[in-house]
Amino acid sequence: MQNYFELLGLEQIYNIDLKILEKQYFAMQIKYHPDKAKNLQEKEQNLIIASNLNKAYSTLKDSLKRAEYMLLLYGVNLNDEKVRSKLSALELSIFWDEMELIENTSSYKSLEEIKSKYELMEKAEVNFLAESFKKQDLSDATIKTSKLKYIHTLLSKLQEKMKLCK
């Protein structure tokens, strides 16, 4: 499998310009559209390339997926128990407390306030991640990615809860 950054002609950095990513993606989709193929073999190749472009785009446009993918490129597997245990017991306890808070909150307005707080935390964590990758501090990038994953989980839970409260 080709490196997603290379496939889309992008520099392998965390803090990518999403407008350039989108521009590159659409340009490549046009170039390798299966309907533009001259024969069956080329059409099959273009289908594979188009599929890889879709995977690359969906991975790189999402801050969490991009971080996980970059760590994977550096040989860090977040599913490894040693890697997952890098978050402190206190951080995990806070996460579970926040999950419980969401579960027990029934006011839509309160949920919106919690959501705003986590959206700010998400932005901050993405900025910290960009710095960690820039310094190639994989240990810190791993911890920041784990935190970002927990924030995404909380935001997802909030979205579900907010739908029920409407």
From Swiss-Prot:
GO terms for molecular function: ATPase activator activity; protein-folding chaperone binding. CDD domains: DnaJ. It comes from the Bacteria. InterPro entries: DnaJ_domain (IPR001623), HscB (IPR004640), HscB_C_sf (IPR036386), HscB_oligo_C (IPR009073), J_dom_sf (IPR036869). Residues 3-73 form the J domain. Keywords: Chaperone. Interacts with HscA and stimulates its ATPase activity. HAMAP family: HscB. Belongs to the HscB family. Co-chaperone involved in the maturation of iron-sulfur cluster-containing proteins. Seems to help targeting proteins to be folded toward HscA. This is Co-chaperone protein HscB homolog. The lineage of its organism: Bacteria, Pseudomonadati, Pseudomonadota, Alphaproteobacteria, Rickettsiales. The gene is hscB.
